[in-house]
From Swiss-Prot:
One of its GO terms (molecular function) is ATP hydrolysis activity. GO terms for cellular component: plasma membrane. Residues 349-584 form the ABC transporter domain. Gene3D superfamilies: ABC transporter type 1, transmembrane domain (1.20.1560.10), P-loop containing nucleotide triphosphate hydrolases (3.40.50.300). It is found in: Cell membrane. The chain crosses the membrane at residues 35-55, 79-99, 150-170, 176-196, 261-281, 292-312. Coiled coil: none annotated. PANTHER family: ATP-BINDING CASSETTE SUB-FAMILY B MEMBER 10, MITOCHONDRIAL (PTHR43394:SF1), ATP-DEPENDENT PERMEASE MDL1, MITOCHONDRIAL (PTHR43394). The lineage of its organism: Bacteria, Bacillati, Bacillota, Bacilli, Lactobacillales. It comes from Lactococcus lactis subsp. lactis (strain IL1403) (Streptococcus lactis). It is an enzyme of class 7 (translocase). This is Multidrug resistance ABC transporter ATP-binding and permease protein. It is a multi-pass membrane protein. Its EC number is 7.6.2.2. CDD domains: ABC_6TM_LmrA_like.
Length: 590
């Protein structure tokens, strides 16, 4: 699967495809916008443009009749038409603005929904900052394109074509001269647009990379500070800031040159046309009123042509955003509801000859087989990096085995819907995730239905967490801060255990939390875990000797393989490495 720079290269290589009408329409359809607003906005823009096109046509006879006096009524009508055109154009801008906001709202909702349904392996290879950039910057770029650039380009093209049509009716020779000059201007525009397209893609990719680095450092700000790594973090970001600066300079040069070059080309063309018009007047082919009317149409062209050119520039800049969003929405996501619903209680969990590797990298697990009988405790022990946590990831179905299968009561777990499976699995890790919000919100996170305060206090009791929650100023409504920074490590663990009690899982997975806790917190957490394990099928990554001794079966894992299994006393007698590991590595619990 292509990610990061590979994705950027892939998009750059297919820029034309990604900005094609087919892909663009696909992206807009995904947003499900309010098409009525778009239609009303475009129609209002068309009406405003048509009114604007009528004004120069009315000026022609008005000027030619000045020799017989000023017609106040016609002058007032011309002014009224200008005001009417401005009013209708304002209405069009407002309606299209609302349309654009509806598009970006729906698109962000769709992109966010897609992100949270992507498999875990996607997030292993894409920085969160890049994902945030897709959600914020790329969607805004698309909104600007469809709410501003496209409608303005549409009305400008209408103004351009309408002006040319009326000019042909008024004086075809002068208009023909302009039609000959237009391709010259387009030849000047083409290389500029190509350069703008390249800058736009590079800018979006660099910005996403910078946001990824910033998000990573800020999310781990305590590590940054405790490690005195501020200089390192600044230097790491400095390269990306400098890269963005260089791209910004190129973009500034591009934006700075774009308008003057286009305006110069337009003015040279217009000057030549005006000179030719004066010549036609001098030969009696054209009247002064016709020339003034033509000049007003030319003023329309001066405004319309740069707008059309800017549209192509914005389209070029948005090509990277459009490509990334389209590719993201095309990613295969997890299907939560596909499969059977099965009650896991009282059923045997088994793994048979399971292998696993991340993509094409070195194999992590080799020929893993184990069995967990109902209500039994299965312990996984072994040196760090052996693959114990990977087994848990496979059980949570974050990844698929590359060989072998995992079954429940003889049935492959892939046959069970993800939602049903995960709703019956509970996991408490060494550093359990706590979300920003209240204690109440964290306890009920991911659960449907209403829970009374009594329900919550009951699970807090079971997790030995009631006392510290009662002592907090707002109790269940206390804010715990981002990632639970306002509470201690032991308190976070006990809240996670209380959350697991509330979920009432049929299969429990534990990564014993001992290393980062003081002895008192560890004792409280262990009591809560012991209570949680009762009456459930439990798989535990063991760090305590008491857990090893109490386990119904132990699997010793080293370098991705099970090298021994059995009860504690059996392994001590038959497995020298296990005996050494127990004596040197495990915490002795009371």
């Amino acid at each position: 699967m292509e990610r990061g720079p590979q994705m950027a290269n892939r998009i750059e290589g297919k820029a034309v495809d990604k900005t094609s009408i087919k892909h663009f329409i696909k992206l807009i359809r995904a947003a499900k916008p309010r098409y009525l607003f778009f239609i009303i906005g475009i129609l209002a823009g068309i009406v405003g443009t048509l009114i604007q096109l009528q004004v120069p046509k009315m000026v022609q006879p008005l000027v030619n009749s000045f020799g017989h006096g000023v017609n106040g009524g016609k002058v007032a009508l011309v002014i009224a038409l200008y005001i009417g055109s401005a009013a209708v154009s304002a209405i069009a801008a407002i309606v299209l603005g609302i349309f654009g906001e509806s598009v970006v709202k729906n698109l962000r909702t769709r992109v966010w929904d897609k992100m949270i349904h992507l498999p875990v392996k996607y997030f292993d290879e894409v920085k969160t900052g890049e994902m945030s950039s897709r959600l914020a910057n790329d969607t805004t770029q698309v909104k600007n394109l469809i709410a501003n650039s496209i409608p303005q380009a549409f009305t400008s093209i209408l103004l351009l074509v309408g002006s040319i049509v009326f000019m042909l009716q008024m004086q075809w020779r002068l208009t023909l001269a302009m039609i000959i000059a237009v391709p010259v201007v387009m030849l000047i525009m083409f290389p500029i647009m190509t350069f703008g397209q390249k800058i736009g893609r590079t800018r979006q990719d660099s910005l996403a990379n910078f946001q990824g680095i910033a998000s990573e450092s800020l999310s781990e700000i305590r590590l940054v500070k405790s490690s005195n790594a501020e200089k390192q973090a600044s230097k790491k970001a400095e390269n990306d800031v400098n890269a963005l600066y260089k791209i910004g300079v190129k973009e500034a040069i591009f934006d700075g040159l774009m308008s003057p070059v286009m305006m110069l080309s337009m003015m040279l063309m217009i000057f030549g046309l005006l000179a030719y018009g004066i010549y036609l007047i001098s030969t009696g082919v054209m009247s002064l009123g016709t020339l003034l009317g033509m000049m007003m149409y030319l003023m329309n062209l001066i405004g319309a042509v740069p707008t059309v050119a800017t549209f192509f520039t914005e389209l070029a800049k948005a090509s990277g955003s459009t490509g990334r969003l389209t590719e993201l929405l095309d990613e295969e996501q997890e299907v939560l509801h596909q499969g059977e619903s099965l009650d896991l209680e009282g059923k045997t969990l088994s793994a048979r000859h399971v292998d696993f590797a991340y993509d094409d990298s070195e194999q992590i697990l080799r020929d893993i087989s184990f069995e967990a009988q109902p209500n039994s405790i299965i312990a996984f022990a072994g040196p760090s990096g052996g693959g114990k946590s990977t087994i848990f990831s496979l059980l949570e179905r974050f990844y698929q085995p590359t060989a072998g299968e995992i079954t429940i009561d003889g049935q492959p777990i892939d046959n069970i819907s993800l939602e049903n499976w995960r709703s019956q699995i509970g996991f408490v890790s060494q550093d359990s995730a706590i979300m920003a919000g209240t204690i109440r919100e964290n306890l009920t996170y991911g659960l449907e239905g209403d829970y009374t305060d009594e329900d919550l206090w009951q699970v807090l009791d079971l997790a030995f967490a009631r006392s510290f929650v009662e002592n907090m100023p707002d109790q269940l409504n206390t804010e715990v801060g981002e990632r639970g920074v306002k509470i201690s490590g032991g308190q976070r663990q006990r809240l996670a255990i209380a959350r697991a009690f509330l979920r009432n899982p049929k299969i429990l997975m534990l990564d014993e939390a001992t290393a980062s806790l003081d002895s008192e917190s560890e004792s409280m957490v262990q009591k809560a875990l012991d209570s949680l394990m009762k009456g459930r099928t439990t798989l535990v990554i063991a760090h305590r000797l008491s857990t090893i001794v109490d386990a119904d079966k132990i699997y010793f894992i080293e370098k991705g393989q099970i090298t021994g299994s059995g009860k504690h006393n059996e392994l001590v007698a038959t497995h020298p490495l296990y005996a050494k590991y127990v004596s040197e590595q495990l915490t002795v619990g009371q």
